[in-house]
């Protein structure tokens, strides 16, 4: 494509603060591009002083002088660049930010997208690595790109689309790198366009901006010769182009527009550069450990310690790999396998993986919350032993929302013994809402009921099936227990082709029961709990006297009542109390962490206030001396 003429005109700088559809499809307020460019020329292109994401928001800026609003003009809301950074801190995990960008591409399947590519390139200007996301979806027209790069705008209201808040692009790109440039082509109403926009934290910081602005250019490519889409004046276009070339990875207009050559007639390419470093001064993302993958650095691998073989075996499982391998994480990120869509990482397609396909002794349990009234609230919970059990003590539930993995290997039971080892479940819970970073769920009453139900399912499945892996059928000694016995009845379930027990998996220490009568099965587990604030160093009160329930059938089981309650009712009540106790302990720990976090934030704010007070005093002295 020939370069654009130098006297062409394109859009003004757009402010990143609006969700309006007004102003002829151009979102947000505008400021003179030449004014912004004037500020841009004051500083040479360079990276931020602090390249660590978690420290990049700690700086003080002397605000620019705000130009008075002209008569008849509406004042637009101003968004400070520090808000852009703080908004991205919702992503504690870098792969969570990458998943947000993958969600955007997956949502484009309805517009014809067949792939999304994730790769690494080297920036010619300084030979630094950059992250590239590219899809062949419908692309974005000029108005669409402005909505994408504006705060809080979301037009995704479908029951199948994943995005919902309208902040995913901004928070995700900022979490991965300081700067991002977007190239997009689309066709709307017979008009084909291509647009370029840059969201640069480096530019905003280095030029002392106190308002987030996004330089953009738009081109009409419907005709034989590309024509600029004019919103302002030739001077504004020249200033916009100057900003793009100065703060993007591309030094000339030709290099900039060449990025469209592999986009095709429609699609989007996002380049994230000035990637963040960790505390040791090396890139947070690793591109060299595996040329077919993008990895997070696992500090425990290089600590020089020799690990036990069981720990090494545990780290070989995907439940551990997905924390550090993007390929492993992407393979499980979506529950249903795509038919005509591929996720391609560094040139190689990702093979989708559903851990439920390899379950041993799988079962399906239908679940619907009592308060649910819609069909969307019911779900099927697939549960079974992982194929590596009992060798690996993997456990937990992979919980999806609208086909997207939110909580991988969520452990709902407390550790301390072998109960639940090897038991893994998979479910799609569309009746609860994910958190903003899509790495957890909102703590609603529906979520709490689901958690309690999953605990019961794990216990029931374990007691009904643990002997199939060679574990002893649990029998609590009559003369030895200072713990609470937790019996449970297995829920109504449908068994899916249970496999015979391999002879090499049978324990030699006890009898193996090959047939299970689920209707008559009884089981028990011993767990001790004390009030959290009365525990000593061993975890129990010194005067704590646990209760023991005999797991063997008694006369009460056949109809005799104790204080009006049968033994079965007492056992059920005991189970409920046990699960409530677990929940309270978990809430107590979460509350303690929250208090510590708030205390830390309070100290930080006190320090900043003291610093600001010193600056104010110094300013007053300067004014008095003047």
From Swiss-Prot:
Question: What's one Pfam family here?
Answer: HATPase_c_3
Q: Can the keyword Coiled coil be found in this entry's annotation?
A: yes
Q: What start-end ranges are recorded for coiled-coil regions in this protein? A: 579-626
Subcellular location, principal: nucleus
Name the source's superkingdom. Eukaryota
Which keywords annotate this record?
ATP-binding, Chromatin regulator, Coiled coil, DNA damage, DNA repair, DNA-binding, Endonuclease, Endosome, Hydrolase, Hypersensitive response, Kinase, Nuclease, Nucleotide-binding, Nucleus, Plant defense, RNA-binding, RNA-mediated gene silencing, Transferase
Name any one GO molecular function: ATP hydrolysis activity
Q: What does this protein do?
A: Mediator of defense signaling triggered by distinct classes of R proteins. Required during hypersensitive response (HR) that confers disease resistance to turnip crinkle virus (TCV). Contributes to resistance against Pseudomonas syringae and Hyaloperonospora arabidopsidis, at early stages prior to cytosolic calcium ions Ca(2+) accumulation. Required for pathogen-associated molecular pattern (PAMP)-triggered immunity, basal resistance, non-host resistance and systemic acquired resistance (SAR).
Protein known as: Protein MICRORCHIDIA 2
Q: Which organism is it from?
A: Arabidopsis thaliana
> Mind giving the lineage of the organism this protein is from?
Eukaryota, Viridiplantae, Streptophyta, Embryophyta, Tracheophyta
Q: Which gene encodes it?
A: MORC2
């Amino acid at each position: 494509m020939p370069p654009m003429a130098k006297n062409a005109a394109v859009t003004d700088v757009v402010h990143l603060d609006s969700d309006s559809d007004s102003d002829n499809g151009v979102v947000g307020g505008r400021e003179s591009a030449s004014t912004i460019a004037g500020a841009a020329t004051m500083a040479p292109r360079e990276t931020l002083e602090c390249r660590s994401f978690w420290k990049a928001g700690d700086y003080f800026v002397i605000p620019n002088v705000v130009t008075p609003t002209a008569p008849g003009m509406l004042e637009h809301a101003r968004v400070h660049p520090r808000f852009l950074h703080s908004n991205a801190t919702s992503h504690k995990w870098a792969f969570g930010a990458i998943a947000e960008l993958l969600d955007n591409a997956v949502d484009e399947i309805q517009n014809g997208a067949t792939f999304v590519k994730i790769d690494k390139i080297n920036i010619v200007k300084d030979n630094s690595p950059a992250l590239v996301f590219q899809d062949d979806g419908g692309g974005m027209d000029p108005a669409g790109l402005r909505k994408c790069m504006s705060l809080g705008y979301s037009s995704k209201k479908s029951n199948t689309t994943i995005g919902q808040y309208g902040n995913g692009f901004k928070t995700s790109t900022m979490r991965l790198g300081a700067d991002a440039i977007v190239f997009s082509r689309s066709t709307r109403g017979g008009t084909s366009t291509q647009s370029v926009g840059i969201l640069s934290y480096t530019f905003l910081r280095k030029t002392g901006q106190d308002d987030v602005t996004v330089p953009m250019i738009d081109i009409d490519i419907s005709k034989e010769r590309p024509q600029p889409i004019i919103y302002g004046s030739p001077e504004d276009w020249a200033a916009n182009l100057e900003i793009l070339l100065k703060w993007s990875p591309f030094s000339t207009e030709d290099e900039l527009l060449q990025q469209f050559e592999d986009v095709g007639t429609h699609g989007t390419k996002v380049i994230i550069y000035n990637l963040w470093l960790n505390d040791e001064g090396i890139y947070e993302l690793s591109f060299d450990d595996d040329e077919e993958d993008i990895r997070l650095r696992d500090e425990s691998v290089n600590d020089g310690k020799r690990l036990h073989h069981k720990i090494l075996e545990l780290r070989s499982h995907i439940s551990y790999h997905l924390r550090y391998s993007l390929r492993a994480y992407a393979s499980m990120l979506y529950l249903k396998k795509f038919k005509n869509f591929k996720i391609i990482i560094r040139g190689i397609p990702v093979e989708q993986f559903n851990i439920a396909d390899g379950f041993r002794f799988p079962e399906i349990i239908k679940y619907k919350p009592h308060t649910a009234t819609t069909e969307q609230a019911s779900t099927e919970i697939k549960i079974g032993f992982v194929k590596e059990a009992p060798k690996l003590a993997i456990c937990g539930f992979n919980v999806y929302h609208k086909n997207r993995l939110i909580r991988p290997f969520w452990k709902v039971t407390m550790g301390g013994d072998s109960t639940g080892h090897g038991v893994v479940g998979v479910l799609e819970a569309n009746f609860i809402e994910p958190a903003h970073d899509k790495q957890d769920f909102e703590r609603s009453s529906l979520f709490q009921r689901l958690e309690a139900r999953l605990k019961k399912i794990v216990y029931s499945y374990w007691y009904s099936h643990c002997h199939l892996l060679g574990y002893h059928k649990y029998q609590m000694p009559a003369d030895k227990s200072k713990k609470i016995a937790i019996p449970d009845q297995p829920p109504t379930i449908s068994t899916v082709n249970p496999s015979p027990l391999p002879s090499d998996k049978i324990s030699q220490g006890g009898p193996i029961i090959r047939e299970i009568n689920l209707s008559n099965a009884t089981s028990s587990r011993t767990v001790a709990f004390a009030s959290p604030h009365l525990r000593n160093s061993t975890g129990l009160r010194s005067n704590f006297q646990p209760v023991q329930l005999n797991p063997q059938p008694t006369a009460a089981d056949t109809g005799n009542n104790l204080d009006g309650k049968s033994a079965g009712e007492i056992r059920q009540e005991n189970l409920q109390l046990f699960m409530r106790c677990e929940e309270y302990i978990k809430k107590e720990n979460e509350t303690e962490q929250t208090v510590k976090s708030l205390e830390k934030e309070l100290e930080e704010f006190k320090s900043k206030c003291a610093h600001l007070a010193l600056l104010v005093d110094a300013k007053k002295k300067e004014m008095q001396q003047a």
